């Protein structure tokens, strides 16, 4: 799949409590050809993912005024949809926060303020990694059980064993 086709097929959900940050990220990603949706709090994020699963989630760690913070949203979504790639963002992040979010299943962590090039690069890598994981799963399903022998002659048995 070409980079352009991957972008057109990719819908990204952006979750941040600051409208200007949501708009900035959406604008950068739109300019790169991605489709975006936005949510401003944890309830909006969970509802948006459950209604129509995005290909990627860009999630702020500190969701002011929300029932859950970004780490709790990450925990919830990783239980429900473990293969959903999530990129965490924060302006108040520490190395410990970044490591904790990645240990909980985030693909990567971007500290605010960020450069547009970094965001574009991480989003592209996350989508490509998710695509490759899906392809591997599909190939494993097509290949079937690895332990099946093509034949059962003594010559084949000697080669396989």
Describe the predicted segments one by one.
Residues 140-161:
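AAA+ ATPase active-site-proximal loops
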Residues 47, 69-82, 100:
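Short amphipathic alpha-helix used as the core "switch/output" element in two-component signaling
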Residues 52-58, 63:
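Active-site beta3 strand of CheY-like receiver
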Residues 1-13:
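Non-catalytic signal-transmission and effector/linker regions of two-component phosphorelay proteins
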Residues 33-42, 48:
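Short hydrophobic/Thr-rich beta-strand motif most characteristic of the beta2 strand and flanking loop
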Residues 23-31:
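Charged docking surfaces used in two-component/phosphorelay signaling
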